[in-house]
A protein has these predicted regions:
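Mid-length scaffold segments of soluble, non-membrane domains
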Residues: 78-103
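Phosphate/adenylate-binding glycine loop and adjacent helical scaffold
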Residues: 131
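PP2C/PPM family metal-dependent serine/threonine protein phosphatase catalytic domain
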Residues: 100-115
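Short, surface-exposed secondary-structure edge patches
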Residues: 38-42, 57-60, 82, 88, ...
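Protein maturation boundaries and topogenic segments
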Residues: 1-78, 148-150, 154-180
Length: 180
């Protein structure tokens, strides 16, 4: 076999392998750019994050998960918010505090306490979500619950800009809503 043919085949194999890896990774992970202030201080406008698109195909959402979803109002851009209430939960917001099933949530990540009140029960197959910038976020307190089938995935990490790299999967973010 001529050297040029071996070299060409090796390059072709490398390109095919790179494309296969790209499509495999792309089917599992999404790259999302944050475009607004609704998740400040956790996320800043201009942050780039990686999203696990298989997270809720293989498991269930948890309190405190930061998720990407298609908005219920049908707008073009996807939303990013934090899961506050799960199916069957009673959510109440009063006096600047959030309560799930009567238990106050510990929320060290919010920009400021909410200046609004809310009360409702999360229906089966839905989530109650809020932005961390409670008073500058369009979220479940305004337009209701997010159907689970609208969820694209779970935010994993901020990867850009480099000085703001951080893990978004933090198990202690929200105290359990079923008790202390």
């Amino acid at each position: 076999r001529p050297a040029w043919l071996s070299f060409t085949l090796e390059i072709l194999q490398t390109v095919i392998l790179a494309l296969l890896l790209y499509f495999m990774i792309d089917s599992v992970l999404a790259r999302v750019r944050v475009e607004n202030v609704s998740m400040q201080p956790t996320l800043q406008s201009g942050n780039f994050i990686l999203v696990n698109k298989l997270a809720y195909k293989l498991g269930e959402p948890h309190y405190g998960d930061v998720i990407i979803f298609h908005p219920p109002d049908g707008s073009v851009e996807d939303y990013i918010k934090r899961v506050i209430g799960l199916p069957g939960d009673h959510v109440e917001i009063r006096d600047g505090k959030v309560f799930i099933n009567g238990n106050e949530l510990y929320e060290p990540y919010i920009a400021a306490p909410p200046r609004y009140n809310y009360s409702g029960d999360v229906p089966e197959g839905h989530l109650f979500v809020l932005g961390d910038n409670r008073n500058r976020s369009s979220d479940s307190h305004e337009w209701g619950f997010v159907p689970l089938e609208s969820v694209i995935g779970k935010a994993l990490v901020v990867y850009w800009p480099l000085e703001e790299i951080k893990n978004l999967v933090a198990p202690t973010i929200v105290r359990a809503a079923n008790g202390p």
